[in-house]
Design a protein with these regions (language model features):
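Repeated scaffold domains used in trafficking and secretory/extracellular systems
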Residues: 20-29, 65-76, 109-121, 146-156, ...
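Eukaryotic tandem repeat interaction scaffolds
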Residues: 62, 83-156
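Aromatic (tryptophan-biased) beta-strands that constitute blades/sheets of beta-rich domains
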Residues: 9-20, 56-62, 102-108, 139-145, ...
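Acidic, glycine-anchored loop motifs typical of Ca2+
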Residues: 32-37, 75-83, 118-125, 156-162, ...
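Loop/turn residues immediately N-terminal
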Residues: 1-2, 43-48, 89-94, 128-132, ...
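Short loop/turn segments that connect beta-strands within beta-propeller blades
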Residues: 5-7, 52-54, 98-101, 135-137, ...
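Blade-level signature of beta-propeller repeat domains, shared across WD40, Kelch, NHL, RCC1
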Residues: 194-222
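Loop/turn-rich, solvent-exposed surfaces of beta-rich toroidal or solenoidal domains
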Residues: 148-173
């Protein structure tokens, strides 16, 4: 294994050359309490918590049957209150503390077909055809007609939060605005999760999504 900087150059001094099994997804970097933590989950159910040199910073005491959901870090007021959240293959939430233990006092059971993300202080949960968002700016419950939903993405544009998600079966792209309203005119045609951005830096928001054969669609958001 190698660590690269933002320019694609290998970082010297990286100690971890090989894991005991295949990495499930790319390593993720978090800063907690001013210290670097690099998380790397393996097929053999091992969670590596490393420092920026690739050395073990925290040894996790138990094995975890990782699902396809990426690891999330929920930051508390202190390191002791901060936890790594993993959803295992049975749909159970595993709360890994930064002393290497797993806190089983807080347990949530989800459907195995779950997508969970924690971003911008918001919990985003997709179970089947249901979307649930909970956080400081957005609190949203929405049920779609199908379970064929893309991963949801949260954006902060012009000091407002927007969430995009796409029903890939019907090719309908949805855009929600804080706290819980669908943007007027949506859903629109699209096959991929859209991006909300002020493309021209003119205070007007664009919504970009792709259709068949990679064709891009640029919608104006009212």
């Amino acid at each position: 294994h190698y660590m690269y900087d933002k320019n694609g150059k290998i970082i010297n001094g990286w100690k971890l050359k090989q894991t005991k099994s295949k990495a499930l997804y790319p390593a993720e970097h978090f800063v907690v309490g001013g210290r670097d933590y690099i998380l790397l989950a393996e097929e053999n159910r091992t969670l590596n918590i490393l420092n920026r040199r690739g050395e073990t910073r925290v040894k996790v005491k138990e094995k975890i049957d990782f699902s396809s959901n990426k690891l999330q870090v929920v930051k508390g007021k202190s390191l002791a209150e901060t936890r790594i959240i993993a959803i295992d293959k049975k749909g159970a939430q595993q709360n890994i503390l930064f002393d290497g233990s797993i806190d089983n006092s807080i347990q949530f059971e989800f459907d195995q077909n779950i997508q969970y993300t924690y971003t911008k202080q918001h919990h985003i949960l997709i179970e089947g055809e249901d979307l649930k968002v909970n956080g400081p700016q957005m609190n949203l419950l929405y049920s779609f007609e199908n379970e064929s939903l893309s991963a949801a993405k949260l954006f902060n544009v012009e000091n407002e939060h927007y969430l995009s998600i796409t029903d890939t079966k019907t090719a309908e792209a949805y855009l929600f605005r804080e706290p819980n309203e669908m943007v007027e005119g949506f859903p629109m045609y699209g096959k991929t999760t859209g991006i909300a951005e002020d493309m021209n830096l003119d205070g007007k928001i664009n919504f970009i999504t792709a259709g068949e054969s990679g064709t891009l669609y640029n919608y104006a958001v009212e």
